[in-house]
Amino acid sequence: MSIRLITFDLDDTLWDVAPVMHSAEATLRAWLGEHAQDLGAVPVEHLWVIRARLLSAEPALKHRLSELRKRILLLALQEAGYSASQAEPLAEAGFQVFLAARHQVTLFPDVHATLEQLANHYQLGVITNGNADVRRLGLAEYFKFALCAEELGIGKPDPLPFQRALAQAGVDAEQAVHIGDHPSDDIAGARAAGLRSIWFNPLGKDWNGGERAHAEVQRLSELPALLASWR
């Protein structure tokens, strides 16, 4: 059966996420040092300790990254001596600073050209566990929909996000393929939901997951020819 729907992961599939997150964390700490001086430019390690405490108490927060980030900031501010009425607006403002920096991504060179070409022949969608918004990245025109774990309440590799994507597009699992970098979240998750899968592996790493993807690419520009060969 021919492919009608292509879903994409975002982080580490359309851009390298590590430098983005490093910069966003640094931007947030600098902002806190200026606007929340009782807390100061808090070490990221301290925020990770708070994160672990919150997740231990409420594991479902791992699927709600924006809420988790706000709660981390709120707790850090309160522990530094800020009252709730002071901490809440500071936490929200700090989160917005972080989120803006988190969207300062450098797309892989072939992203726009590849998505434009594919969008002419297939429905495209996004399935992400992160909180990047394609509308803020200038990519919304290519995608029919974007599904994120925060809105669904569950993330990859659970089958639900993939099943929701199939329903959104009105296609069967055999007519869909998911592309991503993560062996478990993307490849195993897609397989469990009955989709075909393509492993995006730009660094040529050895496979260390379970059942392999149906195909592997090192550049997104390889996708049009690969998908055409499946017709």
Each predicted region: which residue ranges?
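Asp-based, Mg2+/Mn2+-dependent phosphohydrolase catalytic module
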Residues: 1-6, 18-19, 85-87, 112-231
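N-terminal helical cap/lid subdomain that shapes the substrate entry/recognition surface
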Residues: 2-109
